[in-house]
Swiss-Prot record:
TM stretches of this protein: none
Identification of the protein by name: Crossover junction endodeoxyribonuclease RuvC
Subunit structure: Homodimer which binds Holliday junction (HJ) DNA. The HJ becomes 2-fold symmetrical on binding to RuvC with unstacked arms; it has a different conformation from HJ DNA in complex with RuvA. In the full resolvosome a probable DNA-RuvA(4)-RuvB(12)-RuvC(2) complex forms which resolves the HJ.
Cofactor: Mg(2+)
Lineage: Bacteria, Pseudomonadati, Pseudomonadota, Betaproteobacteria, Burkholderiales
GO cellular component: cytoplasm; Holliday junction resolvase complex
Molecular function as annotated in GO: crossover junction DNA endonuclease activity; DNA binding; magnesium ion binding
Natural source organism: Janthinobacterium sp. (strain Marseille) (Minibacterium massiliensis)
Amino acid sequence: MKILGIDPGLRTTGFGVIEKHGNKLTYIASGTIKTPDADLPQRLKTILSSVSEVIATYHPDCAAIEKVFVNVNPQSTLLLGQARGAAICALVHADLLVAEYTALQVKQAVVGQGKAQKAQVQDMVQRLLKLSGLPGTDAADALGVAICHAHSGEALSVLGALAPELARKGLRVRGGRLVG
């Protein structure tokens, strides 16, 4: 399964493509999409068209994107949300299933703790994917999102398969969590 991870940003959007075979993760590609110093619609157009180009080049089977966090500055949060929306539009236009993860979930999946620093994420992404060099922060975050999905997708499919049995015991799966 080929997974495209996206770390959205209005100025710089990171992308990372990995392939999962069983428990093995293989690096395919990563990079950044830099938007021009232009008005908002032009920046969103660049994100939409560039993510579409990445999809056309690498043909992922599914995609994962980082959720927006609420920033101290509400305007920044809104702008980030619009950049994220442009990326999601490109993904769904290509008929990809899109999973969403918080930064906390990504850091836990990659580093093992939710309060990890960016440098720790970069280091672990390099180690997990056996990269020769340290990836840039935006590309590392995007690869981290893809790694998170590679691990989470397996767990969710196992829970989904167990859903009928869990229901008989008065339990159910909600948002990827087991609840009573």
